[in-house]
Amino acid sequence: MQIYSKSEKAFKEAKKVLPGGVNSPVRAFNSVDASPVFMDHGKGAYITDIDGNEYIDYVLSWGPLILGHANPSVVQAITNAAMKGTSFGTPTEIETELAKLVIERVPSIEIVRMVSSGTEATMSAIRLARGYTKREKILKFEGSYHGHGDSLLIKAGSGVATLGLPDSPGVTKGLAADTITVPYNDIEGAKLAFEKYGEEIAAVIVEPVAGNMGVVPPIEGFLEGLRELTTNYGSLLIFDEVMTGFRVDYYSAQGYYVVTPDLTCLGKVIGGGLPVGAYGGKKEIMEQIAPAGSIYQAGTLSGNPLAMNAGFETVRQLTPQDYDVFRTLIKRMEEGLTEISARRQVPLSINKAGSMFGFFFTDQKVTNFDTAKTSDLEFFRSYYREMLGQGIFLPPSQFEGVFISTMHTEKEIDKTLDAFDTTCKILRG
């Protein structure tokens, strides 16, 4: 039985000075009816809270830590950089070195601009798309998260292709009116949207694997269809690979699915655990960004040496063979979960992509946000708390992706399967 007394005390103190006691909403554990666990340190595939409880970590800071916690080479790279100075506000050579590595590995990127978050990357890419095409509307997909930029916090209305409605107080109707939303994996819905608004659409922004409704891969023809649509209408195709970049494949999701967008947004892995974002693409488009062009974007800490060194050392270490191992381990997890859920009579649907996977407590195949929402959320809450008590740290939301690192092995997978079996036995008998 885990003891959380120090975490509970820390949360009470945090709520006095932070909104809801956290700096990002999902960390509050509200969706699992629990108080958040405060972490102290991590090593490899494991993370330890301030009460001394150790967990196998499948959150990995929401994806960035593909090499696991406290990778010695990454820690050394950060330390060496910090000893020289944490930030200069000038160009440094390491920015160029990381940019070269990104360009080498991401098929669509010819030029890349470093920023400080995934949200900043998607906001900047959309501004660039609007400036480049001289159009204003953006098409996105229901249930996909592209950061907290105002124009992207939009909820779909009724019908196949609708103009958006604000999904958060503070988002104006004017911004929402320029956002078109259709269901993920619905190429026919996208076609209808283009038939109605095609000459006004600056860009389609899409996660090539949706990671914020759980993990939902594209169905056959979806990404290819978007590529064809945007090309035919003179719109840009933006892949939001903040989560999937270097997670799905050595060459990111676009390399795995062999679909090349006009612009790509990155984050998470390319910062090695430090704040980072990037957007890049075709030279002719990227050269419209200041100072080469007139579309403005800037940032005080963009390309800061700590994040650049951490990111370079992380990406440098990854090999094509790592992704073979990821797929083998996740297949082992999938087969084990499937066998146990059938034996324990727990409905379960599993999706996977590279080093990411998602599971839903439903009999339905999950291909979009509507089918993701058929998952038994009440069961998930109980399941989550029980798994946490057995030392398995998962995202505290049904609608988040699950990650592994190069430090996860069959040992961790098998321990997790044992915990899953015990949990299902407790909850379902």
From Swiss-Prot:
Gene Ontology MF term list: glutamate-1-semialdehyde 2,1-aminomutase activity; pyridoxal phosphate binding; transaminase activity
Superkingdom per UniProt: Bacteria
EC number(s) stated in the UniProt entry for this protein: 5.4.3.8
InterPro entries (UniProt xref): 4pyrrol_synth_GluAld_NH2Trfase (IPR004639), Aminotrans_3 (IPR005814), Aminotrans_3_PPA_site (IPR049704), PyrdxlP-dep_Trfase (IPR015424), PyrdxlP-dep_Trfase_major (IPR015421), PyrdxlP-dep_Trfase_small (IPR015422)
Cofactor(s) essential for the protein: pyridoxal 5'-phosphate
Modified residues (N6-(pyridoxal phosphate)lysine): 268
Pfam families for this protein: Aminotran_3
Record's keyword terms, sorted: Cytoplasm, Isomerase, Porphyrin biosynthesis, Pyridoxal phosphate
Catalyzed reaction equations: (S)-4-amino-5-oxopentanoate = 5-aminolevulinate
Record-linked PROSITE patterns: AA_TRANSFER_CLASS_3
Gene Ontology terms: biological process: protoporphyrinogen IX biosynthetic process
Annotated CDD domains: OAT_like (cd00610)
EC main group: isomerase
Gene Ontology CC annotations of this record: cytoplasm
Pathway this chain belongs to: Porphyrin-containing compound metabolism; protoporphyrin-IX biosynthesis; 5-aminolevulinate from L-glutamyl-tRNA(Glu): step 2/2
Secretion signal, residue range per the UniProt entry: none
Cell location: Cytoplasm
Main location group: cytoplasm
Similarity remark: Belongs to the class-III pyridoxal-phosphate-dependent aminotransferase family. HemL subfamily.
Subunit comment: Homodimer.
Protein name in the entry: Glutamate-1-semialdehyde 2,1-aminomutase 2
Species in which this protein is naturally found: Listeria monocytogenes serotype 4a (strain HCC23)
Lineage, uppermost ranks: Bacteria, Bacillati, Bacillota, Bacilli, Bacillales
